[in-house]
């Protein structure tokens, strides 16, 4: 039942004082002024509290259980991060600069830490999410080539067929032509394929390393050399940075632009649309094009530098999602250098433990040592049982587990992409393995049981097609 359906005429939670001020003409055009009162629910405070408490109890989150969503890094978010963020909630970005020096210092220290982790020279913290960071990075690349007088010819962005869908979308939004690179049989970039497409018309090569198959791009130094020899830039999608912290750095691999997901790698909560944070780091030759303001060290303090004539301009109001930065800063300070390295080591160990165990039951697309995630290929399983990857995912819900990412990456048919993260214990991983084995046996012995799952969730299977074609965004009587 929606909150609107619980509405009772005349019921109130609070009564506001009489409005005694004179009416003011706000200059709103007459045709835009509401003619009728908004349709708002009339409910008491206890109705509201019970309604949303009930909804919360039906929700699933990493605080409730295992969340192996591939390429999403759904790690546990320490609650100390929230405590620290609360300390800054009384600040306002329009305060005089001298009164927010603590916040500016925090952003400055965070920027330096992230530059050190990624091997970049400068950074903006403004972008609000990963895809926003991608677009910002590509706009920086565009400004760079425009400044060099090469934008007219450099119109192409090369993107592997295993890439996140946001990569080609961001490139197109930035005004580039997207060229797809077919992966090699080993799941990595095919150097011959790259060589065939790489010329002086290429502006950027976008890569994720490890890639979305959970495999490290072993030829990354060669790829970087090939890109730079023709004057192209190498862009790093930071979605999978959780696998390599303290072991290697994108900047050392030859990447010119690096975007991060603070809401993934650095344990700030994400999902359901936000809040996120997608900073981008760059090498020195791209620093003049970063969004303003850039945080600079000024003596013993940090300051905001707006004096960048070649900047692409602001990409986000004020300074970005600041409290998300506070949480990431807290996480980095808590973990330290050794802790972050251990995070990546455990993420890789957990993924390989699951891969080794599940490969005895399911077919792993690339069954060799992986990084932080791996992909199951269920194509033969579907032919054998009639049970699809989606059915397995739905059945997992009955076992109290969140499903992995399904049907991505697109180059693996009936894909199931599993990323356990570093925060899960062996006991939890074994529970997941046990559930996956039971579902496998159910699919063979009683496929209809799996096809009709889930059975224990508040809502069973949604009509995805109609929900996509005819979405309902607001309540109507």
From Swiss-Prot:
Transmembrane segments: none annotated. GO terms for biological process: glycine decarboxylation via glycine cleavage system. It is an enzyme of class 1 (oxidoreductase). It catalyses: N(6)-[(R)-lipoyl]-L-lysyl-[glycine-cleavage complex H protein] + glycine + H(+) = N(6)-[(R)-S(8)-aminomethyldihydrolipoyl]-L-lysyl-[glycine-cleavage complex H protein] + CO2. The modification N6-(pyridoxal phosphate)lysine is found at residue 264. It comes from the Bacteria. One of its GO terms (cellular component) is glycine cleavage complex. GO terms for molecular function: glycine binding; glycine dehydrogenase (decarboxylating) activity; pyridoxal phosphate binding. Keywords: Oxidoreductase, Pyridoxal phosphate. Its EC number is 1.4.4.2. Its cofactor is pyridoxal 5'-phosphate. The glycine cleavage system catalyzes the degradation of glycine. The P protein binds the alpha-amino group of glycine through its pyridoxal phosphate cofactor; CO(2) is released and the remaining methylamine moiety is then transferred to the lipoamide cofactor of the H protein. The glycine cleavage system is composed of four proteins: P, T, L and H. In this organism, the P 'protein' is a heterodimer of two subunits. Belongs to the GcvP family. C-terminal subunit subfamily. This is Probable glycine dehydrogenase (decarboxylating) subunit 2. It comes from Fervidobacterium nodosum (strain ATCC 35602 / DSM 5306 / Rt17-B1).
């Amino acid at each position: 039942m929606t909150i609107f359906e619980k509405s009772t005429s005349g019921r109130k939670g609070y009564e506001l004082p009489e409005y005694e001020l004179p009416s003011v003409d706000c200059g709103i055009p007459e045709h835009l002024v509401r003619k009728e009162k908004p349709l708002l629910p009339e409910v008491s405070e206890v109705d509201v509290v019970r309604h949303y408490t009930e909804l919360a109890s039906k929700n699933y989150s990493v605080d409730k259980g295992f969340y192996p969503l591939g390429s999403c890094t759904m790690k546990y978010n320490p609650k100390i991060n929230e405590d620290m963020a609360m300390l800054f909630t009384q600040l306002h970005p329009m305060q005089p600069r001298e009164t927010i020096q603590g916040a500016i210092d925090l952003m400055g220290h965070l920027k330096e830490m992230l530059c050190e982790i990624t091997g970049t020279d400068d950074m903006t913290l403004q972008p609000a999410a990963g895809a926003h960071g991608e677009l910002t990075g590509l706009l920086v690349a565009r400004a760079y080539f425009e400044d060099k007088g090469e934008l007219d010819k450099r119109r192409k962005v090369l993107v592997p067929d295993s890439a996140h869908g946001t990569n080609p979308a961001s490139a197109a939004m930035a005004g580039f032509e997207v060229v797809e690179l077919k992966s090699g049989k080993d799941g990595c970039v095919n150097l011959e394929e790259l060589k065939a497409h790489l010329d002086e018309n290429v502006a950027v090569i976008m890569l994720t390393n490890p890639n979305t198959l959970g495999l490290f791009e072993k030829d990354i130094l060669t790829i970087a050399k090939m890109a730079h020899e023709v004057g192209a830039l190498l862009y790093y999608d930071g979605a999978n940075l959780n696998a390599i912290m303290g072991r290697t750095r994108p900047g050392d691999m030859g990447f010119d632009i690096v975007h991060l997901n603070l809401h993934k790698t650095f344990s700030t909560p994400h999902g359901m649309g936000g809040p996120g944070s997608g900073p981008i780091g760059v090498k020195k030759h791209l620093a003049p094009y970063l969004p303003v303001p850039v945080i600079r060290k000024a003596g013993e303090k940090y300051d905001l530098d707006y004096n960048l004539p070649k900047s692409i301009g602001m990409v986000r109001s004020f300074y970005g999602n600041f409290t998300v930065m506070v949480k990431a800063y807290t996480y980095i300070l808590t973990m330290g250098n050794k802790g972050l390295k251990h995070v990546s080591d455990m993420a890789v160990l957990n993924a390989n433990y699951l891969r080794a165990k599940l490969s005895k039951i399911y077919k792993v697309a690339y069954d060799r040592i992986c990084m932080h995630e791996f992909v199951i290929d269920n194509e033969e399983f579907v032919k054998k049982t009639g049970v699809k990857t989606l059915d397995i995912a739905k059945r997992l819900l009955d076992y109290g587990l969140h499903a992995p990412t399904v049907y991505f990456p697109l180059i693996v048919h009936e894909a199931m992409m599993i990323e356990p993260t570093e925060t899960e214990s062996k006991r939890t991983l074994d529970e997941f393995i046990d559930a996956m084995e039971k579902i496998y046996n159910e699919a063979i012995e009683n496929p209809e049981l799996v096809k009709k799952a889930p059975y224990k969730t508040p809502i069973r299977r949604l009509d995805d097609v109609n929900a996509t074609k005819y979405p309902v965004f607001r309540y109507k009587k």
